[in-house]
Amino acid sequence: MKIAVIGYSGNVDETPVKQLGEICEELGHKIAIKKHILINGGTDGIMALVSRSARNASGEVIGIVAGLESGNKHLSFEFKTGMDSSMRSVLMMYNVDAIISVGGKAGTGLELFSAYLMGIPIVLLRGTGGWTDRIAGVLIEGKYLDERKLVEIKNSWNVDDAIELAENSKRR
């Protein structure tokens, strides 16, 4: 299964990424030991942390990188898109079976909306801040972004449940 982890970009030693280090380490490690392929934007922040822990557990990590910039050193494979980060995010959604969201700013919000419109299962790892927690407050019936009910957005409060929810979801 190809699982995307989306969330905050930025320096791993600064707020808010630093506070999520343990969660990201656990998430990347457990995705890898379950033999799933980890896909992300391939650069810094949450992406670097989950990539590092997945690679340390001998997992496969694909970075779908914006523009022509270099991805982080923990990627098994780096795909330079030549696209801005918004378009890169949409391209990434076409290549995943499910996403797990950890915190995040506007780019994460874009990825959440794109995944929803494409019928990609979404798991919110709650308590991580940003759009991951913020979007939960606007969900219809606690699980849909709009009346079309394209895909159920699931809430998790720990890494094990987040992965299990992703594994048990089907892309529309």
Predicted regions span which residues?
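Acidic/glycine-enriched connector segments
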Residues: G21, E25, A32-I33, G41-S114, ...
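Generic N-terminal amphipathic, Lys/Arg-enriched alpha-helix
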Residues: M1-V17, G28-K34
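A generic secondary-structure signal marking the coil-to-beta-strand transition
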Residues: M1, L75-F77, E152
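Short, hydrophobic alpha-helical segments
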Residues: A166-R172
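C-terminal binding/interaction regions
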Residues: G7-P16, S86-D160
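Short, amphipathic alpha-helical "lid/cap" segments that border enzyme active or binding sites
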Residues: E25-G28, V159-E164
